[in-house]
Amino acid sequence: MEGTRLGFEIVGDISNIETVAVGSSIREIARLRRQYGPGRWRKLKGIAMVRLPDATLCRAEVHWYESHGMGMCEIKVKRLLEE
């Protein structure tokens, strides 16, 4: 999975996945529905290894939106984690 246009790439799987919000609890729900279409939108977070633009590998907390049939959208690195 790549997020290179965002300046990072996810390497491997995302672990410790948790749901942050669902449906109308998502602050950006109107924009998501307008931009990507209707669906059961969820905001999730998890831990992943990411490759930064300088080729450094590190663990990071990542957040993203997901809808059935749509997959992952707008993946963001929220913070880098200490090893």
Locate the predicted segments by residue.
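Cysteine-centric segments in proteins
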Residues: 1-83
